[in-house]
Amino acid sequence: MKKLLATAILGLASLSALAGSATVEYSNVEGVNGAKNGKGYLVNWNDSITKTLDGGFQMTTAQTDGTNSVSTRVEASLTPKYALGFGTAYIKGSVGLKLNSAGSTEFYAVEPGIIVPLGGGFSTRIGYRYRAAFDSGIADTTRTARVGLTYALTKKDALTLRYDQQRGNSEQNSVNFAYTRSF
Protein backbone atom coordinates (compact mmCIF):
# COMPACT_ATOMS: atom_id res chain seq x y z
CA MET A 1 0.00 0.00 0.00
CA LYS A 2 2.82 2.43 0.88
CA LYS A 3 4.52 1.88 -2.49
CA LEU A 4 1.27 2.40 -4.40
CA LEU A 5 0.50 5.56 -2.46
CA ALA A 6 4.03 6.93 -2.88
CA THR A 7 3.91 6.19 -6.63
CA ALA A 8 0.56 7.97 -7.02
CA ILE A 9 1.76 11.01 -5.09
CA LEU A 10 5.06 11.23 -6.99
CA GLY A 11 3.22 10.82 -10.29
CA LEU A 12 0.92 13.72 -9.54
CA ALA A 13 3.84 15.74 -8.22
CA SER A 14 5.67 15.33 -11.53
CA LEU A 15 2.59 16.67 -13.30
CA SER A 16 2.62 19.77 -11.12
CA ALA A 17 4.98 21.43 -13.59
CA LEU A 18 1.94 21.64 -15.84
CA ALA A 19 -0.33 23.06 -13.11
CA GLY A 20 -3.06 25.52 -13.95
CA SER A 21 -2.72 27.25 -10.58
CA ALA A 22 -0.54 27.36 -7.49
CA THR A 23 -1.53 28.41 -3.97
CA VAL A 24 0.50 29.33 -0.91
CA GLU A 25 -1.26 29.51 2.44
CA TYR A 26 -0.48 30.49 6.03
CA SER A 27 -2.61 29.24 8.93
CA ASN A 28 -2.80 30.64 12.44
CA VAL A 29 -3.96 27.73 14.59
CA GLU A 30 -5.73 28.06 17.94
CA GLY A 31 -5.81 24.85 19.95
CA VAL A 32 -9.08 24.06 21.73
CA ASN A 33 -9.96 21.70 24.58
CA GLY A 34 -6.39 21.85 25.92
CA ALA A 35 -4.60 21.54 22.57
CA LYS A 36 -1.67 23.88 21.88
CA ASN A 37 -1.64 26.70 19.35
CA GLY A 38 0.45 26.48 16.21
CA LYS A 39 1.21 27.61 12.68
CA GLY A 40 0.61 25.92 9.36
CA TYR A 41 1.93 26.34 5.82
CA LEU A 42 0.51 24.91 2.61
CA VAL A 43 1.63 24.79 -1.02
CA ASN A 44 -0.88 23.47 -3.57
CA TRP A 45 -0.75 22.84 -7.32
CA ASN A 46 -4.03 22.29 -9.13
CA ASP A 47 -5.12 21.79 -12.74
CA SER A 48 -8.22 20.95 -14.73
CA ILE A 49 -8.11 17.44 -16.18
CA THR A 50 -11.48 17.96 -17.87
CA LYS A 51 -14.09 20.70 -17.63
CA THR A 52 -15.64 18.96 -14.62
CA LEU A 53 -12.61 17.27 -12.99
CA ASP A 54 -9.57 18.81 -11.28
CA GLY A 55 -6.41 17.09 -10.09
CA GLY A 56 -4.16 18.43 -7.39
CA PHE A 57 -1.09 17.92 -5.24
CA GLN A 58 -0.33 19.66 -1.97
CA MET A 59 2.16 19.71 0.86
CA THR A 60 1.35 21.03 4.33
CA THR A 61 3.56 21.56 7.35
CA ALA A 62 2.26 22.24 10.84
CA GLN A 63 4.29 23.29 13.87
CA THR A 64 3.03 23.32 17.44
CA ASP A 65 3.95 26.48 19.37
CA GLY A 66 6.49 26.05 22.18
CA THR A 67 7.69 22.67 20.91
CA ASN A 68 9.83 21.21 18.18
CA SER A 69 6.84 19.18 16.99
CA VAL A 70 6.52 19.34 13.20
CA SER A 71 4.15 17.31 11.05
CA THR A 72 4.18 17.26 7.25
CA ARG A 73 1.50 15.91 4.93
CA VAL A 74 1.79 15.19 1.22
CA GLU A 75 -1.53 14.72 -0.56
CA ALA A 76 -2.86 14.01 -4.07
CA SER A 77 -6.48 14.72 -4.98
CA LEU A 78 -9.19 14.46 -7.61
CA THR A 79 -12.14 16.85 -7.48
CA PRO A 80 -15.26 16.28 -9.59
CA LYS A 81 -17.29 19.49 -9.99
CA TYR A 82 -21.00 19.88 -10.67
CA ALA A 83 -22.51 23.11 -12.04
CA LEU A 84 -25.57 24.36 -10.19
CA GLY A 85 -27.74 27.31 -11.12
CA PHE A 86 -26.18 29.48 -8.41
CA GLY A 87 -22.69 28.00 -8.01
CA THR A 88 -20.57 24.88 -8.22
CA ALA A 89 -20.73 21.79 -6.00
CA TYR A 90 -17.60 19.68 -5.57
CA ILE A 91 -16.48 16.46 -3.89
CA LYS A 92 -12.71 16.39 -3.33
CA GLY A 93 -11.19 12.96 -2.72
CA SER A 94 -7.59 12.72 -1.50
CA VAL A 95 -4.98 10.20 -0.47
CA GLY A 96 -1.81 11.15 1.31
CA LEU A 97 1.07 10.48 3.63
CA LYS A 98 1.64 12.07 7.04
CA LEU A 99 5.29 12.32 8.08
CA ASN A 100 6.56 13.11 11.57
CA SER A 101 9.18 11.93 14.06
CA ALA A 102 7.05 8.86 14.84
CA GLY A 103 7.16 7.69 11.20
CA SER A 104 4.60 7.82 8.43
CA THR A 105 0.86 7.20 8.16
CA GLU A 106 -1.26 6.84 5.03
CA PHE A 107 -4.58 8.66 5.08
CA TYR A 108 -7.58 9.51 2.92
CA ALA A 109 -9.90 12.51 2.95
CA VAL A 110 -13.27 13.40 1.44
CA GLU A 111 -14.54 16.98 1.22
CA PRO A 112 -17.93 17.86 -0.24
CA GLY A 113 -18.65 21.55 -0.61
CA ILE A 114 -20.05 24.38 -2.65
CA ILE A 115 -18.56 27.51 -4.23
CA VAL A 116 -20.92 30.44 -4.82
CA PRO A 117 -19.97 33.61 -6.74
CA LEU A 118 -21.10 36.73 -4.87
CA GLY A 119 -20.32 39.39 -7.49
CA GLY A 120 -17.69 42.11 -7.60
CA GLY A 121 -14.89 39.54 -7.79
CA PHE A 122 -15.95 37.82 -4.54
CA SER A 123 -16.94 34.18 -4.03
CA THR A 124 -17.55 32.03 -0.98
CA ARG A 125 -16.77 28.39 -0.34
CA ILE A 126 -18.40 26.22 2.29
CA GLY A 127 -17.11 22.68 2.82
CA TYR A 128 -16.81 19.78 5.24
CA ARG A 129 -13.68 17.60 5.25
CA TYR A 130 -13.44 14.13 6.77
CA ARG A 131 -9.92 12.71 7.11
CA ALA A 132 -8.84 9.34 8.53
CA ALA A 133 -5.87 6.98 8.49
CA PHE A 134 -6.23 3.88 6.31
CA ASP A 135 -5.17 1.90 9.40
CA SER A 136 -8.11 2.21 11.82
CA GLY A 137 -5.74 1.56 14.73
CA ILE A 138 -4.02 4.92 14.16
CA ALA A 139 -5.60 7.96 15.80
CA ASP A 140 -5.67 10.39 12.85
CA THR A 141 -9.36 11.10 12.28
CA THR A 142 -10.67 14.65 11.96
CA ARG A 143 -13.83 16.40 10.83
CA THR A 144 -13.37 19.96 9.59
CA ALA A 145 -16.11 22.48 8.84
CA ARG A 146 -14.80 25.35 6.72
CA VAL A 147 -16.02 28.60 5.24
CA GLY A 148 -13.96 30.90 3.04
CA LEU A 149 -14.17 34.16 1.14
CA THR A 150 -12.11 34.69 -2.02
CA TYR A 151 -11.45 37.95 -3.83
CA ALA A 152 -10.16 37.88 -7.41
CA LEU A 153 -7.56 40.65 -7.63
CA THR A 154 -7.17 39.98 -11.37
CA LYS A 155 -8.16 37.15 -13.72
CA LYS A 156 -5.02 35.31 -12.56
CA ASP A 157 -4.57 36.38 -8.92
CA ALA A 158 -6.82 35.75 -5.91
CA LEU A 159 -6.70 36.19 -2.13
CA THR A 160 -8.61 33.90 0.22
CA LEU A 161 -9.53 34.21 3.89
CA ARG A 162 -10.86 30.94 5.37
CA TYR A 163 -11.96 29.76 8.81
CA ASP A 164 -11.66 26.06 9.72
CA GLN A 165 -13.07 24.33 12.78
CA GLN A 166 -11.40 20.92 13.16
CA ARG A 167 -12.54 18.30 15.66
CA GLY A 168 -11.48 14.73 16.32
CA ASN A 169 -7.98 13.51 17.14
CA SER A 170 -6.78 17.06 16.45
CA GLU A 171 -8.92 19.83 17.97
CA GLN A 172 -8.29 23.32 16.66
CA ASN A 173 -9.71 26.38 14.98
CA SER A 174 -7.67 28.14 12.33
CA VAL A 175 -7.73 31.34 10.33
CA ASN A 176 -6.09 30.78 6.95
CA PHE A 177 -4.74 33.33 4.46
CA ALA A 178 -3.98 32.21 0.89
CA TYR A 179 -2.73 33.63 -2.39
CA THR A 180 -3.50 31.78 -5.64
CA ARG A 181 -1.86 32.42 -9.00
CA SER A 182 -3.39 30.91 -12.15
CA PHE A 183 -1.23 30.22 -15.19
Name the predicted role of every residue range.
Residues 2-183:
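Outer-membrane beta-barrel proteins
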